[in-house]
Amino acid sequence: MSKESRIFIEISENIIDLNYWYKIVSDDSSGATSSFLGTTRNEFKGKSVERLEYETYEPMAIKEIEKICKTILNGFENDIKKIGIVHRIGNVPVGESSILIVISSGHRKSSLEAVHYAIDTIKSTVPIWKKEFYTDGSENQWKGNCESCHFNNNNHPH
């Protein structure tokens, strides 16, 4: 099986089907399947959120996600079996999912660490932008990802 046949990527406006993606990465040689499911929460910095809207330059986003997947397949003690990543674009209401990362591996440590690496790297390198829409009608702004802002207490506006 080539590395490319172990990578499954989709950018879609459709609701994410968890069972479908778990089946895609299912592998009889796997002892673990780990995942991350990102959902739209109902609040941001005290404002009530109605929905998020995502946009991307799809060819570049897919290319960047492929790079991340290949890095994962070449690392983690060559224990990764398959990787599935789907990111929604368009409107994603509160409670619905915007991204799913599912990774199967021989052992749990590899898939858990790979999922963590994947989401952090996707959020910092892949050209996908979101706009929050608030229930009070206040100004909506496009936001890029700035992973370190939330963890280092930097006072960025997003």
Curated annotation (Swiss-Prot):
Pfam families: MoaE. Heterotetramer; composed of 2 small (mocs2s) and 2 large (mocs2l) subunits. Its EC number is 2.8.1.12. It catalyses: 2 [molybdopterin-synthase sulfur-carrier protein]-C-terminal-Gly-aminoethanethioate + cyclic pyranopterin phosphate + H2O = molybdopterin + 2 [molybdopterin-synthase sulfur-carrier protein]-C-terminal Gly-Gly + 2 H(+). Substrate binds at H107, R108, K123, K130, K131, E132. It comes from Dictyostelium discoideum. GO terms for biological process: Mo-molybdopterin cofactor biosynthetic process. This is Molybdopterin synthase catalytic subunit. GO terms for molecular function: molybdopterin synthase activity. Pathway: Cofactor biosynthesis; molybdopterin biosynthesis. Keywords: Cytoplasm, Molybdenum cofactor biosynthesis, Transferase. It is found in: Cytoplasm. CDD domains: MoaE. Its main location: cytoplasm. Belongs to the MoaE family. MOCS2B subfamily. GO terms for cellular component: cytosol; molybdopterin synthase complex. Catalytic subunit of the molybdopterin synthase complex, a complex that catalyzes the conversion of precursor Z into molybdopterin. Acts by mediating the incorporation of 2 sulfur atoms from thiocarboxylated mocs2s into precursor Z to generate a dithiolene group. It is an enzyme of class 2 (transferase).
